[in-house]
Structures are given as C-alpha cells and as structure tokens.
C-alpha cells in the first residue's frame, strides 16, 4: 500500500509506503531480473553478432540471443547462477516506511522471489562455514537518501563467476590515466573466460577504498553503452573498450573480437595521496530491474 498526505497546510507532502508493498515488489523484481534480459543487452548481442568475425563467436552470440528469448517466454532463469541479490535503494526524504523494518522487508522479498520463482539458492550465511541459507538471503543493500517522496528499488542479481574476477588497486597519483588503463586491461586479461564473456566492465576511479568499489558496481547499472557525461571519461571508456576487445578473448573465451559489450566508468573526488581504481566485471547476463514506489 502506498498513500500520500500533507502534514500541514502548505507543508511537506509525506508518502507512506507499507513494507507489504515492498516485499511484493522485491519478490517480483527477483524473478523479472532473472527471466527478462534488458533490451539494451539484447541489442548489444545482436550488434556484436553482426560484427563478430569468429564463426565460433557468432555461434555463441546466437545461442545467447536464443537463450534470452527462451528464458523470457518460458519464465525460467537465463543462467543457472541466479545471483546474489544486490539491492540499490533511493529513499526519498519525504517517505515514511510503515509495517516493519525496511531491510527485513527487502530480505523477505528476496526470500519469496527466489522460492516462488524456483531460483537457485546461492548464498551461505557464514563465509567460512559455508552453510547455505536456503533462501538466497541475506541480500546486499545499498541505500541513498534523495530529495522527494518516492522509493526507487533497483535489484541486480550478481553471479559469482564474474564477481570473483573483479579487482581493486590503490594506485599512486603519478600512475595517472595510463596506470588506470593498464590495471583495467590486465584485470580483464587475467579474468580470461572465467566471467563468461562477452562482459560488461564497470570501473570506479577515486574516492576511498570502499567508495571506489561502489562506483564500479554502480557503473554496471548504466544503460549499456551510455557514455559518461564527462568528455575525458567518455574518451577513456572508448579507449578501454577498444583495447579490451583487442585481447581476442571472445565470447565464452573461445576467441573473437567480442570480449566486452561495454565499458562504463564512474568517478569521484580522491585524496591527494591516492588514486583508487576498481574493476567490477559483469557476465553477459547483465541483469537489473527497477521499480519506483
């Protein structure tokens, strides 16, 4: 349930959102993200198919297109790894949550979505004891407070294979843009076939250790191929895209010119002594769906 009211005449408009609605929407997003690949990714597959010179690579890209179509039509996961539920919340400062704890509601939505959608349960409760929680919780939840009276929920299931190939390095400021490029390209090269290419490469530059990693993760949420608003960063994205595709890793690591579908770079201010760089790799199943309440 979602309802709005003014707290006083001419005052701030407060929207109340019940956790029952949040649970329902998160459960839906879990399934939708795993069943329906974004149109931007499908178009990138088709473009890559037309440009790929390797017959093996073309065959794999055709299979990926067909696989995505079957998943959508039959409402089954496009990949057996249905991912860690990574949730991004943009919580309007004029929103009131009622009916329980917001984070508990998110986790209950994930629990229901993965259970009712027969999605693989991939999460262990303790990283060393390795006992599966059996319901794909806990989710990873990132919250940003923003102006307004809406709650935006973005759900991005993240597979283990591509996440394992991600990396972060604290460069020296003197390393500059060439140092950044070298690290990104080396990370992709070392990953080879493991993240199930063609990949999407999210890069974070600046901030602190944890902010840099977050930037790289957020870069993966951008519509595929959408350029940075900063001309120098857009140029860097283009250069990295070209260099990565020269590596010849190709679709599923079997050779070809399509190693990456896109490179997205996000930046933030940095300390005078630091140049943090993070690379978060996404497999070809670039899944994320959103809703605004």
Which positions does each model-derived feature cover?
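Non-transmembrane, aqueous-exposed alpha-helical and coiled segments at domain scale
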Residues: 10-293
């Amino acid at each position: 349930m979602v309802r709005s009211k003014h707290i006083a005449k001419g005052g701030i408009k407060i929207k109340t959102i019940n956790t029952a609605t949040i649970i329902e929407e998160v459960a839906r997003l879990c399934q939708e993200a795993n069943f329906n690949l974004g149109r931007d990714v499908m178009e990138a597959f088709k473009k890559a198919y037309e440009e790929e010179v390797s017959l093996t690579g073309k065959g794999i890209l055709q299979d990926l297109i067909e696989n995505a179509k079957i998943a959508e039509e039959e409402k089954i996961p496009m990949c057996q790894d249905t991912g860690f539920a990574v949730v991004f919340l943009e919580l309007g400062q004029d929103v009131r949550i009622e009916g329980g704890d917001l984070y508990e509601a998110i986790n209950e939505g994930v629990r229901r979505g993965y259970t009712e959608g027969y999605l693989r349960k991939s999460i262990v409760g303790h990283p060393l004891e390795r006992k599966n929680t059996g319901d794909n919780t806990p989710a990873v939840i990132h919250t940003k407070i923003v102006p307004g009276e809406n709650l935006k929920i973005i759900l991005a299931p993240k597979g283990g294979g591509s996440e394992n190939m991600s990396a972060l390095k604290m460069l020296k400021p003197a390393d500059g843009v060439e140092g950044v490029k070298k690290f990104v390209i080396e990370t992709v090269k070392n990953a080879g076939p493991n993240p199930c290419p063609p990949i999407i490469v999210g890069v974070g530059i600046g901030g602190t250790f944890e902010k840099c990693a977050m930037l790289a993760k957020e870069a993966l949420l951008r519509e595929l191929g959408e350029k940075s608003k900063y001309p120098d960063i857009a140029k860097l994205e283009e250069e990295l895209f070209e260099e990565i595709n020269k590596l010849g890793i190709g679709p599923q690591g079997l050779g070809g010119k399509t190693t990456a579908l896109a490179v997205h770079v996000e930046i933030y201010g940095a300390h005078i002594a630091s140049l943090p760089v993070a690379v978060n790799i996404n497999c070809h199943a670039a899944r994320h769906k959103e809703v605004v309440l």
